[in-house]
Amino acid sequence: EAGEECDCGAPANPCCDAATCKLRPGAQCAEGLCCDQCRFMKEGTICRMARGDDMDDYCNGISAGCPRNPFHA
């Protein structure tokens, strides 16, 4: 929702303040295929394995999401 940095539905999430729906101090992310222990995973980390004729997708180091490779089938 607007103004939220993270999903405040899970009070046990160590990255997200459930009362404010904001990331806790020092946290870069709260969830996502490229988020590990509240930090963005290193650029080049595989976040989605290739299937069929597709290629692996990799974290970019600046986002919690797993960007699709430009050659996604």
Curated annotation (Swiss-Prot):
One Gene Ontology biological process: angiogenesis
Record's protein name: Disintegrin saxatilin
Disulfide bonds: C6-C15, C8-C16, C21-C35, C29-C59, C34-C38, C47-C66
Record GO terms (molecular function): toxin activity
Record family assignment: Belongs to the venom metalloproteinase (M12B) family. P-II subfamily. P-IIa sub-subfamily.
Domain Disintegrin as annotated: residue spans: 1-73
Record-linked SUPFAM superfamilies: Blood coagulation inhibitor (disintegrin)
Name of one Pfam family that matches: Disintegrin
Assembly and interaction partners: Monomer.
Keyword Secreted (UniProt): yes
SMART domains: DISIN (SM00050)
